[in-house]
Structure formats: structure tokens, C-alpha cells
Amino acid sequence: MIIATSLRSQTFCTWRAWRAVHSTAVRLESKLNEVPIDRTRNIGIIAHIDAGKTTTTERMLYYSGKTKRIGNVDEGDTVTDYLPSERQRGITIQSAAISIPWNNHKINIIDTPGHADFTFEVTRSLRVLDGAVTILDGVAGVEAQTEKVWKQATSLNIPKIAYVNKMDRPGAGFSRTVMEIIEKLQTRVVLCNVPYFENSKDNDPVFCGVADILHVKLLKWNPEIDPHGKNITVIDIEAERDTYPEVYETVVKSRESMVETLGEFDEAIIDSFLESNEDYMNIPINVLNEAIRKATLENYLTPVYCGSSFRNIGVQPLMDGVVKYLPSPLQISVPEITSSATKNVKIKHVKAKQAVKQDMEVTTKMNNRTGLVVNANPNLTLALAFKVMTHATRGVMTFFRVYSGKLVSNSIITNTTTGKKLHVKKLFMMHGDEPEEVKHISSGNIGVITGHEDDIQTGDTLVSHSHLKKGFSEMESNLKLLPIEIPPPLFNSAIEPQTAGDEAYMKECVRILTREDPSLKVSVDEEMGQTIISGMGELHLDIVKERLVRDMKAKVTLRDVAVSYKETLLNPGSSYKQTSESGSVSIEIEMDSFEGAAEESSFFEENGAMIIAEDNNIIIIEPSAISQNMLKALEERRWKSTYSLEDLQEIVIQGCLTALQMGGPIFGLSLHSTVIRVKSWDFPVADSSVASTVLLDVSRSAVTSYIATNRDWFGILEPIMETRVYIDSDIMGEVSHDLTQRCQAVIKSIEDESTQDVDALAWAKDEAEKTFLPPDYTMKAGKDAISYKNKKIIIAETPLREMIGYLSRLRSITQGRGTFDMTYIGMRRAIKSRFDAISKEFNFM
């Protein structure tokens, strides 16, 4: 922190004049969609809820000239938060994409939600980002959701910049927050600027600017004179060192720390230091910038900025940091691309092990002018669909990221997930919820396709060829980018139409919502005649209700939110054989179960095993299961059925899947972690008159009959969470008792907040010692006073049901000082006492 006692008249230049000297270009010289790939940045704004993501994004839009006025969350007039629920609640629910010009670059920004219920929105956004701006609340520091999203980004090797926001708030601590960045996020840092304060008439520090460490300049904003923050006073600190001695001293020490950190990574810094007569301040800025950029791209360190977005202070330097230090699409890790010569199972959410074994090698090369080239084919376009939304006037809009080639309007694309060919008439770039039509979307950019209501879904791979007559090779027509994983839903709510006449529109609205948000699931309780909608949390389903009733005007009733339970087979029974009335179609099955992830189960190692990903089930069609009649028909070429062997196998799978979703014998809940083994099956392929629906019915009936015959061997599964409760040590006993008694928690450990990993803590302390941090006015003795000795983390495994409403109880116990977060770890078989408690929810006892 830097404090000046008064504002004296100084020699200064304006921000515009200073940037004309220190930047390559101030204004974008060409159309936004024509910006070269090396000057394109795809970034996400990530953080904990209420850290200021949307507020910062709105300032970026304003300062870039994209908007004429600043949108504010509190006033409900933001560009990126455009849903009525977002504007009313003041939170981000859907990720929003927008492109802006800045300093002769194009920045594609995705503003993501911060609430844990909308984690899937963050997950799918991270898949198409090249860099991220992590925003931290300067008062709260590194919060739980920040850690989670940071780890997600790190696992994807995404370089990051940190921005300490809300420096105008009482209790904001820049250095304290940077210490937490080092310790909790486990990253080195370089301070690109530090906060500057002036004392008010009451002798209170007032945040009014930042000291730029690289350029040795003091940047001052005056919200009273210029509330929009466009005019910035730029003061040469070195020339005015006598007027600002503390500012100069802080900048010098910060520069020294920066050089020392960079010197451990880049020998060019050491060479430049020696050439500069070992003067830290004489190292050329371009050398420092290049070293910071290289270190950031390799995730060696994180550049740190600070500001107050709401007060319009510090956002422009952050935008400069984005274009200087975050990667272009030319500098990212090549995405995982596969191509299978065999067709995968067509049923949605089915993964077949045998298809994985036949993947073909896909070659990739980065072209410095056009970007990634796949299969040595510059005419090939490869893109990933990562989001679908419904626009008020444009209809269905699919967001996609182009990884190679160029997608042009009025072209033909192939969805390699489904094999469908689609005609793309128009392409768009997005401005919040407003589309802007363009002729093409080139490699490294994010665009939108309209139409194709049911033809493209989240996670689908799209390919196109600029020479239609040549078409695709077999490899290219089967190219697939790594799909986007969809987490299992944890909460349910029954939804009912108010009248029979409202049912059709209700179903259409639900279909739209689930198309936009794949983390929403819909099932039907046949016994109760109810539609069940499942989501990630209570807030998630509250938003669904608001959108249905208020936005879509659907006349529906949503019941109270309940936890999503499942049923499973506890003990395997004998095999069961089902035959059609004519006797020509038959199937024999066995059922079993397992615990844990299907991919890790020994059942998945067997030939013919396929995972039904949605409920962690496995279907095994044994290679020997096909009947002798079918084999002979193949060998003797007497196959008259219009269905191929592959088609018939998929019908068997679909029949089994339908039965699993129809539910178990206890409460009719869908089955989970269950194995269906097809021992034998027969279909009269020599007779073209037999319909495939007979095989579908027989397959379904075999499973439902098995369940009915062995109903006493089924049990309940409930979702279990790893819960971390962050509290002061003096109330640890009371909180622990509440967790074990009222929440049925099993406490795994109680740790000091700073000692979860001894090696990580030792590294963080060593790194902090080498990093200069200016003293915080909120702390008496600077960084030496920072201590987490009185903070504890209780780590426990808890049934999700018992954590509903826990936050209000925790706040009551801790007087508002406690927080917690939860992570889903899997389904667990309910013991007798838990089974009895769950039964009461279904009015069964």
C-alpha cells in the first residue's frame, strides 16, 4: 500500500498520451473479425461469487468503446448478465461471450458464473479458453470457489492473471490477498502494479490509483471529477521521487523482487541485469515484458494487478496485461483430438471401450499465420460446440470455438458425434445476447451458428471442408475433440402442468432448458405421473422455476426441492430369459452391481462392455451372446433384415437403458452403478418382416422382469459430499458437534487452514520470503503479521440431504464468520438408519 498525505501540483501527462508512447497502437486499425490470430485473446473471467467479475467485464466493454455507457449489476442493466433472473438477483447464471478491441488486439471475453450451482457453465467455458483473469475480492481474499476454478484452469494448463478487486473497501488488503494467492493457489507472482492511497480530511486512506512497476509511473483516477474513469493522471515517479518518496521506494523494491523472480526462470533477465550495470531499474521494459509473458504462458508465475472496478479504477492496466501476457491461439497446448475408424455407439451418453482401442493417430501442426492445421490439411475446419442458447428472435444459437481452419457462412458442416451433415447459412459473433452477423469465423475464434434445433448439442465436434468436391477422408469424418463432461445432478423437483392443456407447452419449455443446460436432467415418474427435473443445487432449480414461470410464461407448479437418490442391486440373482410371443426374438440377461466409477470397475475391462454415463451403469454384450442362427445368416449371406448387426445391438442397449431409467422396485428411482450382462440374444435376421420394436420390447421386459423377480435384493444410494467447513478455532467444538449430530457427518480430519499440505506450505513460505509485498493499512505489521493459526478446516463426508439449509445454521453458530463448500464424491449405499430417514421423504413409512 502507498499513502500520500496530500495531492500537490505535479508535471504529468494524460493516459492517452502516455499509452501512445508505451503501446504499439491505441486504436484497432481493421475490422474486429479480421484481426490476425496472433493478436487474438480468448479469455475467461473467473472467480468466487460477488468478487466483481461482471462489474469488471462491463468496464472492459466501456473502455474498449464497445458500449457507450457502463452497465452496473446493482442497476440490472449489464450487457453480459442479460437474463431477467441475472439482473434481478445480481448474479451471473449463464456464461456470456463478447468480443472487444483493445490496443490493436481482439479480446474474446467469456464472463462466467461464480456460484457453485453453475459450475458446469464454468467447466464448458474453460474448455474453449486460452487464458483467464482471476478476480479476487481484496477484502475476502482467496475464497473457496476461486480455489476450485483455479484448479480447473490449471488442470487444463490455462495461463492466468490475477486482479485484486475492491481495493476501495474498508478492510481490503492487497498484500494479504497476494500472500493467499501464493499459499492457497500455489503460484509465484510478479506485481505489475500496487495500490496507491491518499489520506482524506479525516485521515482515512482513500484508494485512488496504482503505481505501475514496469513503467515507474503513478496512475491516478479522480472519481469526483471523472466518475467514468476515462481520464487518468500519469505521473513520472522517478522524476517526482522527492514528492512521492514512499511510492518510489515501493516501486524500486517491487521491481527488484520482479527481476529476482524472473531471473530464476529466464537467463535473458540475468544477462540484461548485468548489461544494465546491475541496476534493477535500468533493465529495458521490453525485456521484462517478454520474460513475464513467457513465464505466464508456461504457468511458472502469475502477474498481479489491482483496482476497484466499481469505482472505475485500475481496469485499463488490467486490459493491457491481458494482451501483453495471456496467450494467443498460436501459443496454447494442442487440444486432444481422436479419430476412430469404427463407428461408436450412437446412443447418447454411451461410451464403448472397444471403440477407444481403434483410435487412429491424428497429426497436428501449428502454422504461425493461420493457426492449428489438423491432418496436414489446411482446408479442414475443426470446431467444438460448447454452448446452446435460445434467442428471442434468432431461435436456437450454438456457440462454437474454431480450433483449425475457417468456418464460412453458407457452408456444409458434419457433426462427427452424430454423423449428420448440416447447412450453415449464417454465422455470428456475440455481444452479450445480441448477435452480429459475420462472413466467417477463423481459427482461434468463438462464433455462433443459428438454427439446427436438435442437430447440435454441447460437446459435439464439427468439421467442414473448404473444397466440398474433395470431401473428407475416413479419418477426418470421424475426428473428435475431447467431449465436455457433464456432472451428475444432485437435486430433484417434480414439475406439473396446472391443467392437462398446459402439459404440451410445459414439455416444450423443459426441452428448451435442458438443451441449453445439459446439467439439467428430466425423467418421468410413471407411477406418480410426474415429470422430474434434476439439477446441481437448490439455486439451480430455483432459477429453472423462474425461467419457466416468469420468462416462458409456462403454467406449471414446481414441488419442493429434494435430493436425487438412486436405486441399485445389492446382490446378484440368477439369470433371466425373456422371449417374444412368437418365440422368434429372445434375450437372456444377468444383473450385478459395483461401487465407485464405472471406468474403474473390473466389469468395464470385459469385452463388449459399454458405460451408460448418465447413471454410471454398464451394459455388457458378450461376444459369444449372438445366436447361431444370426451367425449362420451372416456367413451364408441370408441376412434379409433392414437392420445391421450394429443397429440391432444398439436396440438391445436402448431397451436395457429404458428399463434402467424406469426405476427400481423400492421407490421407482432410476438404477445406478448396475451391470446388465447380455448372455444370449436372438433375432430372425433371415425374415425381413419382423420389426425392431419387438427386440426393443423384449430387451426392456427382460430387465424389468429381472428387477421384479429379485425386488428384495435392491437398495438405496444417496449422494455423499466432501464438505470443508472454514471456521475460527474457538468454535471448532460446537461446529464439529453440529456436523456429526445434525448432519450425520463423518469427520475425516481437522486441519489448520495453512497446513493442509506441509510441502506446499513450506514452498509458499519460501516464495513469500522472496516476494516483496508493500504493507497493508489493514494490518499492523505488514506481511509478518499474517497468520492463519486461528483458522481451522473441518473436512468431513456428509450425506447431501443433511446439508440442505446448513449455511444459515453455520452462520448462526459462528456469528457470520464461518463458510463451507462441498464437492460431490459419489453415491453410497444407505445404511438402515439412513434408509429409514430417506423413506420418510417418500411418505413410505
From Swiss-Prot:
Positions of GTP binding: 47-54, 111-115, 165-168
Cell cycle is among the record's keywords: no
Alphabetized InterPro entries for the sequence: EF-G-like_DII (IPR053905), EFG2 (IPR030851), EFG_II (IPR041095), EFG_III (IPR009022), EFG_III/V (IPR035647), EFG_V (IPR035649), EFG_V-like (IPR000640), G_TR_CS (IPR031157)
Highest taxon listed in the record's lineage: Eukaryota
The organelle targeting sequence, given as a residue range: 1-28
GO cellular component: mitochondrion
One GO MF term: GTPase activity
Protein location: Mitochondrion
A Pfam cross-reference name: EF-G_D2
Xref: CDD domains: EF-G, EFG_III, EFG_mtEFG_C
Occurrences of domain tr-type G (ranges): 38-330
GO BP terms: mitochondrial genome maintenance; mitochondrial translation; regulation of mitochondrial membrane potential; ribosome disassembly
Tagged with keyword GTP-binding: yes
Gene3D superfamilies found in the cross-reference section: 3.30.70.240, Elongation Factor G (Translational Gtpase), domain 3, P-loop containing nucleotide triphosphate hydrolases, Translation factors
Keyword annotations from UniProtKB, A to Z: GTP-binding, Mitochondrion, Nucleotide-binding, Protein biosynthesis, Transit peptide
UniProt xrefs under HAMAP family: mEF_G_2 (MF_03059)
Family: Belongs to the TRAFAC class translation factor GTPase superfamily. Classic translation factor GTPase family. EF-G/EF-2 subfamily.
UniProt-listed NCBIfam families: small_GTP
Function: Mitochondrial GTPase that mediates the disassembly of ribosomes from messenger RNA at the termination of mitochondrial protein biosynthesis. Not involved in the GTP-dependent ribosomal translocation step during translation elongation.
Name of the molecule in the record: Ribosome-releasing factor 2, mitochondrial
Organism ancestry: Eukaryota, Fungi, Dikarya, Ascomycota, Saccharomycotina
